[in-house]
Amino acid sequence: MRFRVDGTLREVVQPNRALHAALISRLKIMADLDISEKRLPQDGRISLRLGTRAIDVRVSTLPSAHGERAVLRLLDKSESKLSLEAVGMQGETLRRFEGLISQPHGIILVTGPTGSGKTTTLYAALGRLDATRNNIMTVEDPIEYELPGVGQTQVNSKIELTFAKALRAILRQDPDIIMIGEIRDFETAQIAIQASLTGHLVLATLHTNDAASAVTRLTDMGVEPFLLSSSLLGVLAQRLVRKYCSHCHGSGCEHCGQTGYTGRTGVFELLVTTDAIRAQIHNQASEADIRTAALADGMALMREDGERLIAAGVTSREEVLRVTRD
């Protein structure tokens, strides 16, 4: 049994193998899954309350050579009041990103691998916007935190409620701002771009390695370059690095489980779509050319942002090198 804490796996305990079937069955009962079905993957959820904290547990089971595996993802509903500063955004990146989310229309992308904090950043961005003066709507899978004053919709594959179908319905709900949990296909990308061109501010996540590759990823999906160049406001790429333990500052102690780290913060790379970059996108420039143009316009790479954290004594060089590339 292993826990992923601050992005790294730790073995916690090795239960007796004889307990395996009973543990899996109990989890499946709690998650309202079919305990007799052992041949197919299943997904479910468990809602728990620990004191005043509401915990949502996402359960995924998968058959394997040695029996079923189960992975549990914990979502603490009480941690919804996040700010951009709390996720680690500072200085010029914060100022420029706030400028992007204050625009009346266009699309902003937040990109990175799974577990890099993209959705948390989107929630923090929505928290900056006035939900009383704007009709803010989201489509997510799953809804990770409940936001007051925001209309949140969760996709449901069992009834064929996809991102694209939910987005079409949301556009009939008079939204000002739309948040899309993830752009997974051309249909979703197309609706998102069209929404941003018709007077809506759209915020969405995408799975790419850096800011420049988000542009080529969308064009590879089939989005027309002239539409993307007209609608894209900017791309924020990010990773999470572990922070030094405040008690031992990296040497390892009982407070951090001898790892030297507790908690995480973000390193960011913000590409703002200037006229020069719009021209590059329109002309179907390569990823390298778009990155070069962005650097000329003042974009700082994630590794450079990480250097700031190293200099401030927040994290180690090894951590920054672990999650970023040249």
Language model segments and positions:
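Short, flexible helix-loop junctions that flank or precede catalytic/ligand sites
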Residues: 1-326
